[in-house]
Each structure stands twice: as C-alpha cells, then as structure tokens.
C-alpha cells in the first residue's frame, strides 16, 4: 500500500510542475522570439547568402571577390579598431583608477560627472560633431591658431583614420569606464590599504592590486566596443570620403549601388569571424583564470 501511494505521488509531481514550466516559457518567449527574428535569422541568412550564387548553387566566389576587392578595407578596419581599443583601454584605466584611488574629492566628483556625457549621444550625432571639430577649418584647428599654438598654414584635416580613432575612443571610453570603475570599486579596500601601508604608491596599487581583479570587466567592455565599432556606419561615412574605409561603409556601398548582397554578406562574415575570435580568446582567458584560481 505504501509503495503504490509513493508511485502515485511521484507520478503526480511532474503534472504539478507543468503549469509552472509553461508559465516560465511564456515569460521567456518574447525575448527568445526577438533574438531569433532580429539576430539568429539575419545571421543565418547572411551566412547562406555569402556562399550561394544567383542560381542557388553553393560557391566561394563571393568570399574570394570580397578579399580581392576589399582586402585593404579589411586591414584598415582591423587597424583602426585595434588602435581605438588600445586608446580606449588606456584612457578608461586612467579615469577608473583616479575615480577609485583619487585623493582630491572635488576632482573625483567633477570627473565622475563629466566622463559619462558621451554615453547619451548617438553615433550619428558623434560623427557630425567630429566632422565639425576635426576638419581643416574646424574648431580644433581654430582654437590652436587663435591661441598661437599653431600657424594657420599648418592646419590640417583629421578626417581620416586618426579622426576615426579619436571619435571611436571619445564615444566608447565612457562605456568601458563605467564597467571598469564599477569593478574597481567592488575590490576589497583592505587589499589597497595593505599595499599602501607596505609603501606602494597609487600607481602601483592600480596596476598590481586593483586592475588584475577588475580585468574581466575591462575585457567585456572592450569586446562590446569592438562589436559597436565594427557595426557602426554613420561615423566612417561622415569622416572618410575615399578609400580605404571601414567595412560597414563598403557593405552599404555594395548593396546601394550594385545590389550585391553576396559580397556584402561575405564582408559581414569577416566581421562575424573577427568578433567570434575575440570572444573566444576572452572565454579561454576566463576559463584559464578560473582554473588556476
């Protein structure tokens, strides 16, 4: 009798859990639908289109032509993104370190208030600001000429790779700093105080105590910045008029003027691969750090 009652109870438990599971699926369904329709489906279509010709046959011609026609643009994109990430990392570490270890309260409050402003400015507005600021007769050169720091004949345009690097850094530094400063603020203050009592200065505390513990947040911010810089179209379209340029501008050019989705998706495939490799390296480093911890 006891055995039969326990069997009946064990069979009744899943039936009681079914409504709860169904309710959970209903709550998650809108998010899953958005991911499938807005990310997974376009990704699958772009991958298929990159390897199929107009007749529907499988081919690698689109990838080969993309590398032959836009190889310089691919290298240019990788170079600009790499320099931008290095600049973003350096500035973000400096700002975050001062926010956490700074000894002047009013300067810390002022910096905390100022550095976040570019977060609320869209990329298209950022591109227009940079175009007006970095041009030959832009605000930067006019200020340098008026203050006597540069002759008017020496003014030059920064609407090239340098302008792209400065614009990307100006836009993404606040985002990375926000993540990194939060991670640094979560570090146990006793570690910092122990290092200071042992004679370490603030710079050494930053690079040997605080930054190693906050490094995962820095990597996350840089990877997300990489994705943002590889996907933005407005900034390279506004700042660079010739070649080479960013891959997003070439993809838009290929679709707008030629209707060639095959080569455009092949260029997008290279962006996917670059982002995936970067994310894979981050995951490997994270797993190795957790294994040795």
Across the structure, where does each feature detected by a protein language model lie?
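Glycine-rich helix-loop "coupling/hinge" segments at transmembrane-helix boundaries
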Residues: 52-56, 233-261
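Membrane-water interface segments at the C-terminal ends of transmembrane alpha-helices
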Residues: 20-52, 69-153, 159-185, 213, ...
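Glycine/proline-centered hinge or cleavage motifs at structural transition points of membrane proteins
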Residues: 198-200, 212
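Short cytosolic juxtamembrane segments of multi-pass membrane proteins
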Residues: 285-293
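Short alpha-helical segment that forms part of, or immediately flanks, the ligand-binding pocket
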Residues: 115, 192-193
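Short, Lys/Arg-rich, polar N-terminal cytosolic tail immediately upstream
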Residues: 1-20
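A short amphipathic helical element positioned immediately N-terminal to and/or at the very start
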Residues: 58-67
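Short glycine/proline-centered loop/turn elements that form peptide/ligand docking sites
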Residues: 187-191, 290-291
